[in-house]
C-alpha cells in the first residue's frame, strides 16, 4: 500500500481526529490503524508522561482515551515512527 504525504494534515489531524492526546493501544476495534516504520513516517510519535499538548505527543493510558489505536505491521491508514524528541507531522 502506498502512503501519501498528505494523509496526515499539517494541523495534526487525520479524518478530523487529532493525533495527540491520551492513547489506548488496542488489538481490535480501533479508531485508527497505523503502521510503525523506521524512517520517513507520516507522523513522528513521542510517548510522554505529562499532559500531551503538541502534535505527535502520545500519553499511553489504560482507560478514558482520546483515541484508540491499533498498530498493524502490514497495513495502516498512515505510518508512524516512535521518536525520543521532535514529534510531529512528516519526516
Language-model segments: residues:
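Repetitive, compositionally biased segments used for assembly/scaffolding
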Residues: 2-91
